[in-house]
């Protein structure tokens, strides 16, 4: 199912951007059968796989919203982004949010330069409502994640069952060095295209 979501979303996004049917199909086919996804399945990173498969739909919805600034675009964006957040892979969701921001900067700056204040207020209102709807759509997994966060290695304290209670380390979660290291080192990019490179 997730392969279909990613493939069809990529295909329609490419068609929306003006590519031919053949080019769109080849792009969607290449995106869907990327070798890295097999590694995600094998290593148990299914949440990351689902979040990546939602990426073309979210980007398509963001482009559509920023080009048209209407309710249909806001609804499409809210549904797609909310469903991506529901996949619970917050690293990919964060990268998607950065990508959405980079897509939306130019139209808003253009409107500011042209002093289209009414259009800016309308667009920001629709965008805020759609982000709130996205968060409401994904509230259940977000609340669960916030509930178990203090007991996660990314939260405040973890328990080591091999140590006595008085020997436990009290920490404030991940240190900055660990949290900001590469999840995929740049030299591993060749492995995405050619496995075991």
Regions found by a protein language model. Give the residues of each.
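Short intrinsically disordered, low-complexity coil segments enriched in acidic
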Residues: 1-6, 14, 175, 193-197
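Membrane-embedded helix bundles of polyisoprenyl
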Residues: 3-17, 21-111, 123-145, 151
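Short hydrophobic helices that act as membrane-entry/anchoring signals
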Residues: 107, 111, 122, 187-195
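Membrane-helix interface linkers and caps
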Residues: 112-116
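Aromatic-residue-lined binding/catalytic grooves and analogous aromatic/hydrophobic interfacial grooves
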Residues: 119
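Periplasmic/ER-lumenal interhelical loops and adjacent helix-loop junctions
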Residues: 140-197
């Amino acid at each position: 199912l997730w392969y279909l979501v990613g493939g069809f979303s990529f295909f329609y996004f490419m068609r929306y951007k003006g590519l031919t049917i053949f080019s769109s199909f080849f792009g969607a086919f290449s995106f869907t059968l990327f070798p890295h996804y097999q590694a995600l399945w094998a290593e148990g990173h299914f949440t990351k796989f689902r979040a990546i498969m939602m990426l073309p739909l979210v980007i398509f919805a963001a482009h559509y919203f920023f080009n048209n600034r209407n309710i249909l675009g806001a609804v499409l964006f809210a549904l797609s982004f909310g469903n991506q957040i529901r996949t619970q892979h917050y690293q990919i969701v964060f990268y998607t949010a950065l990508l959405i921001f980079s897509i939306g900067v130019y139209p808003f700056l253009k409107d500011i330069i042209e002093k289209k204040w009414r259009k800016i207020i309308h667009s920001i209102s629709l965008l805020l409502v759609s982000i709130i709807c996205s968060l409401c759509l994904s509230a259940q997994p977000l609340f669960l994640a916030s509930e178990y966060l203090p007991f996660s290695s990314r939260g405040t304290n973890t328990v080591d069952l091999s140590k006595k209670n008085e020997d436990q380390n009290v920490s404030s979660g991940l240190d900055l060095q660990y949290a900001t290291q590469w999840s995929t080192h740049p030299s591993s990019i060749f492995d995405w295209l050619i496995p075991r490179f």
